[in-house]
Amino acid sequence: MQARYSVSSPNSLGVVPYLGGEQSYYRAAAAAAGGGYTAMPAPMSVYSHPAHAEQYPGSMARAYGPYTPQPQPKDMVKPPYSYIALITMAIQNAPDKKITLNGIYQFIMDRFPFYRDNKQGWQNSIRHNLSLNECFVKVPRDDKKPGKGSYWTLDPDSYNMFENGSFLRRRRRFKKKDAVKDKEEKGRLHLQEPPPPQAGRQPAPAPPEQAEGSAPGPQPPPVRIQDIKTENGTCPSPPQPLSPAAALGSGSAATVPKIESPDSSSSSLSSGSSPPGSLPSARPLSLDAAEPAPPPQPAPPPHHSQGFSVDNIMTSLRGSPQGSAAELGSGLLASAAASSRAGIAPPLALGAYSPGQSSLYSSPCSQSSSAGSSGGGGGGGGGGGGSSSAAGTGGAATYHCNLQAMSLYAAGERGGHLQGPAGGAGSAAVDDPLPDYSLPPATSSSSSSLSHGGGGQEASHHPASHQGRLTSWYLNQAGGDLGHLASAAAAAAAAGYPGQQQNFHSVREMFESQRIGLNNSPVNGNSSCQMAFPASQSLYRTSGAFVYDCSKF
């Protein structure tokens, strides 16, 4: 008798029932030697006992292969192809794309060893499939090639019978009448084809309606390829002769133009150090560079106040990611600015989540600097607003922390004269106009002090705050990165209204727990929730919103 008893590895001897000292000794020796049990005549009678033979059937005895029936090799497994697929393979493999029945049998047996057995069963199925399926056509044999048996070939309409050329998946059962019907439809479509290019060109001027409320600009009558390229959701509108920074710097809500073409805004933002007004240098980057530049179309303020619905944002997001994101960036700046001036809360901006605006997540200062670009010029609320934004405008082009810090320190120095005038509303309204990760306008400046120094004093009209939260909680930046920003904010607060320092510290105490829980940086005075409060008492009523806001992230 051969040993029916085996273990999968020498170390797993615990599987074996204990059979007495002598046998366990032999077992251990055999395992150590890596040999089989047949070398030991003594225990053999024990192992070949019928009970053990049943307990450890042959399926477990693979460790000692020679003594067990060999498992089926892989090619003996039935191939996953249907008989239709097998016949199709054989026909397509034949030189003339036609083959006899015997040729089909031979091809299948050569290719798939599984079919070398039980020939009668599967060959019957092959014949059955050949006669039953309309995709296989019998071609009578001509006299040039003597022999017996007709040729089989594929119906020309059935070549796309399998999905993506994979024989594993068939689209549907091929029927001749369906194929004829499809052919007729194709013929009809072919006759009607000349008009469709016209129809394809019609929608090009339509996107102004798609983006709700965007100012429809004059379209040049000949539709060129550049326009059609941008047709997928963004508006291929006439180029604006102003860059976003210069356009937003125009100062009053009524004349803030909607930056429509994504390429104009993205090109001017990406042109790095070009000064705000020098659009001609940035313009060649855009898609429709050849277009003549008509005068800018000022959008009416109502558009901005009701402006950015989710549909609008999503349609513009569908365009080229980089361009539309930049468009959203600048467009939202304008809309937030105007709507905050009109006293309407801008909805939560989805621009920050757009895939193209990777710059938002790439560096701590990028978001606030782009905000600064619009912010600065847009609200001529007191001379201070203008100068802080002048630094911010450069920041938009270069996305640089230094400019951000400069604007902070500048704002700190002029903090005193910024807080007072109602014009502060204007500059504040535009100073931080991206309400990216924050609640609506009530949450004025939980971290606006971190993004713009002036923001602390002017925050009574901020649409919402950002940058501080975004930087430390979204990017998990260490507090040290924000150190100079926060200290500058504190300086701004001190310069603006030293009398409120006690409130400042008490509020900071209130946020201690959130800072511990949410901030990766060590808990220090300059952590992310630090707030520089303006003189208006209205802010303190919304501290509940701040607590919610902090814990939310």
Curated annotation (Swiss-Prot):
Motif interval(s): Nuclear localization signal 2 (NLS 2)? 168-176
**Region (Disordered) residue spans:** 173-326, 356-393, 420-466
Q: Which residues carry this modification: Phosphoserine?
A: 237, 243, 274, 320, 521
Where does this polypeptide localize? Nucleus
The record's region (Required for transcriptional activation) falls at 1-51, 466-553
What keywords is this UniProt entry annotated with? Answer: Activator, Angiogenesis, Developmental protein, DNA-binding, Nucleus, Phosphoprotein, Repressor, Transcription, Transcription regulation, Ubl conjugation
Segments carrying the region annotation (Required for transcriptional inhibition) are 217-366
Mutagenesis / variant outcome for changing residue 237 to A: No effect on sumoylation
Outcome when changing residue 229 to R: No effect on protein stability, inhibited sumoylation, increased transcriptional activity
User: What InterPro entries does its record include?
Assistant: Fork_head_dom, FOX_domain-containing, FOXC1/C2-like_FH, TF_fork_head_CS_1, TF_fork_head_CS_2, WH-like_DNA-bd_sf, WH_DNA-bd_sf
Q: Does the keyword Transferase apply?
A: no
Q: Which cysteines are joined by disulfide bonds?
A: none
Where does the record place Low complexity bias? 243-254, 262-291, 356-372
Entry comment on modification after translation: Phosphorylated. Phosphorylated on Ser-274 in response to epidermal growth factor (EGF) in a ERK1/2 MAPK-dependent signaling pathway; phosphorylation contributes to its protein stability and transcriptional regulatory activity.
Compositionally skewed regions (Basic and acidic residues) per UniProt: 177-191
The record ties this protein, via Pfam families, to: Forkhead (PF00250)
Its main subcellular localisation, reduced to a broad class, is: nucleus
Q: Which SUPFAM superfamilies match?
A: Winged helix' DNA-binding domain
DNA-binding interval(s): 77-168
- List, as start-end ranges, the regions of compositional bias called Gly residues: 373-393
**Compositional bias per record (Polar residues), positions renumbered to this chain:** 306-322
GO MF annotation, one: sequence-specific DNA binding
Q: What does the function comment of this entry state? A: DNA-binding transcriptional factor that plays a role in a broad range of cellular and developmental processes such as eye, bones, cardiovascular, kidney and skin development. Acts either as a transcriptional activator or repressor. Binds to the consensus binding site 5'-[G/C][A/T]AAA[T/C]AA[A/C]-3' in promoter of target genes. Upon DNA-binding, promotes DNA bending. Acts as a transcriptional coactivator. Stimulates Indian hedgehog (Ihh)-induced target gene expression mediated by the transcription factor GLI2, and hence regulates endochondral ossification.
**What is said about its interaction partners and assembly?**
Monomer. Interacts with C1QBP. Interacts (via N-terminus) with GLI2 (via C-terminal internal region); this interaction is direct and increases GLI2 DNA-binding and transcriptional activity through a smoothened (SMO)-independent Hedgehog (Hh) signaling pathway. Interacts (via C-terminus domain) with PITX2 (via homeobox domain). Interacts with FLNA and PBX1.
Under the heading PANTHER family, the entry gives: FORKHEAD BOX PROTEIN, FORKHEAD BOX PROTEIN C1
Protein name as catalogued: Forkhead box protein C1
Q: Which organism is it from?
A: Mus musculus (Mouse)
Q: Source taxonomy lineage?
A: Eukaryota, Metazoa, Chordata, Craniata, Vertebrata
